Amino acid sequence: MPKNTNYDLIIFDWDGTIANSSGIIVESIKQVCASKQISTPTDQKISSIIGLGLSEGFRKIFPYMNSAEQKEIEQLYREEYLKRVDDICLFDGVEVGIKGLASQGYFLAVATGKSRRGLNNALNKSN
């Protein structure tokens, strides 16, 4: 356990906390809406679902869609997001801060609404 603390585990959120990905998420959803010619939620409404699981978030911003329509939109979003994933970077100072915490003996973890595969992909791209 690190010195002078009762905590040995620190859990970080990924999108918008460690990774500067909010703009990519918003733009990906807007592009999907444009390609499907459906009403585009506001940037604020889209931003409000960041951190939720994809299905849960999309139910909130597309409540009028049936299950099949939502699954199609989710798949289109995944494809659009992957086109932009190389543009995601860590916020300034995050890498140094995380390395510093790890060197002090803290266990570090990430909490996210992403799938495990999605998080692994994002981690690999941000190295």
Model regions: which residues?
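Active-site neighborhood of HAD-like aspartate-dependent phosphohydrolases
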Residues: P2-S48, Y64-S67, S103
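Short, acidic loop-to-helix structural element flanking the phosphoryl-transfer center
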Residues: N6, K83-V110, R116-N124
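Short, structured helix-loop boundary elements
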Residues: S22, D43, S47, S67-E74, ...
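Short alpha-helical
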Residues: I24, G53-E56, V96, R117-G118
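Conserved hydrophobic residues forming the short capping helix/wall of the S-adenosyl-L-methionine
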Residues: C33, F62, L123, N127
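A short acidic, helix-capping loop that chelates divalent metal ions and anchors anionic groups
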Residues: P41, E56-R59, E80-R84, G118-N120
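A metal-dependent, Asp-based hydrolase signature
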Residues: I50-E80, D92, G100-A102
